[in-house]
Amino acid sequence: MTTALIFAGGTGRRMNSRSKPKQFLEMHGKPIIIYTLEYFEYHDDVDTIVVVCIREWIDELKGLLKRFGISKVSRIVPGGETGHDSIYCGLKSMKDICKKDDIVLIHDGVRPLITKQLITQNIEAAKKYGNAITSETARESIVRSTDGEIICEVPPRSQMYTAKAPQTFYYGKILDLYERAKRDGKKSIDSAHLCNLYGEAMHIVVSTPNNIKITEPADYYIYRALYEAMEGQQIFGL
């Protein structure tokens, strides 16, 4: 079985949106979270979806699922204090529906320009290599600094990637890593970071360049422009 675990627990403080969290902001009458969920809803290889959501917005999400016909969501789980905690909450909630050798795709609810092909590539790579980390090749030079003032390293751009999502694993393995982190008192930025903390080898699936995460106000307008451009291509057959 393949499960999509969608993280929609962020409050979106950087979006300066006081009325609602960023994942519930609308474009053309549809919330961002629904655009994201639809890709997994309509993918033949995804059997079920689990969503981690802000507790106060769970009822709102339930209404949206019904309104937009999202039927694969089997449960909605309250999030934790951090992204790490929220993913762990989601993984724990799946113990009664997932076997150790099932596949789980961990994805951001505010990353709505994923593609069917990228989901397929993640599933296939995870089955073959044990995991799949969607990553984009670096377009500009990346520098490293330990104090925020002095550059101590400029790694070769050809070796640099940006980790994105989905990040896909065997369920038993990724759950074990989060449980180890809890015992050890460790926190991670994302699941790829957690794998690195424990010395796990990871396999790259190259991302599409438009697989953006909506974090700040400018991201929303970039997303809208990209979405409308893709819609225009379909309408005019470009």
Identify what each model region corresponds to.
Residues 2-59:
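N-terminal glycine-rich phosphate-binding loop and ensuing alpha1 helix
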Residues 6, 33, 90, 108, ...:
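Residue-level signal for inorganic ion chemistry
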Residues 15, 40, 61-65, 122, ...:
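Hydrophobic packing residues within well-ordered alpha-helices of enzyme cores
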Residues 26, 113, 168, 213-214:
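Short aromatic/basic micro-patch
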Residues 34-101, 182-184:
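Conserved N-terminal catalytic core of the sugar/cofactor nucleotidyltransferase
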Residues 98-110:
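Short beta-strand-to-loop acidic/aromatic patch adjacent to the donor-nucleotide binding site
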Residues 211-238:
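Hydrophobic helical membrane-anchoring modules
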